[in-house]
């Protein structure tokens, strides 16, 4: 019984410490602390697991980490009470190039908040990318090897006048 009480105190103390790291902007460290804490929380405590998973996702989203996808999935799986989790998850999917899944998550969020401009713009952006993929332009982008040669002495091309100025 005492061991269970110490374990719960340890988890709560770790969450508070991670919250302090998050508050001062140390997102990487806070994300790692949330990740380690998430593993220690019992599967029966869904509310706490959802909160910790969401905070881990927020930390990873802020530092542009792809780990945010898994964290947001865990928060949704554990029934995080705020619908903002769907918007954040959609944004991370959008950044990672998973546009179809991002559109689904934007739609879920827009059911609860139909007038949210950020979600509408995100969904529109995903739809535009899908459309652009099917209707590509005639322009081709190619690597300019002559500017990236290691053995050339031209570090950066420059224009000079006839006087040498």
Set out the residue ranges of the language-model regions.
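Alpha-solenoid helical repeat scaffolds
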Residues: 15-16, 47-55, 84-88, 104, ...
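Short, conserved micro-motifs composed of acidic
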Residues: 24, 85-88, 95, 99, ...
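Bacterial Sec signal peptide processing site at the extreme N-terminus
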Residues: 7-27, 41
């Amino acid at each position: 019984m005492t061991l269970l009480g110490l374990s719960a105190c340890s988890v709560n103390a770790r969450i508070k410490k991670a919250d302090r790291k998050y508050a001062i902007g140390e997102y990487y460290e806070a994300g790692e602390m949330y990740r380690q804490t998430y593993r220690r929380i019992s599967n029966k405590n869904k509310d706490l697991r959802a909160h910790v998973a969401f905070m881990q996702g927020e930390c990873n989203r802020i530092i542009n980490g792809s780990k945010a996808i898994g964290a947001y999935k865990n928060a949704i799986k554990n029934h995080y009470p705020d619908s903002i989790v769907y918007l954040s998850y959609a944004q991370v999917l959008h950044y990672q190039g998973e546009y179809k899944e991002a559109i689904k998550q934007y739609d879920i969020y827009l059911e609860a908040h139909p007038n949210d401009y950020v979600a509408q713009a995100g969904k529109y952006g995903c739809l535009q990318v899908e459309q652009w993929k099917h209707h590509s332009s005639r322009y081709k982008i190619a690597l300019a090897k002559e500017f990236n040669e290691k053995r050339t002495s031209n570090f950066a091309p420059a224009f000079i006048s006839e006087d040498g100025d």
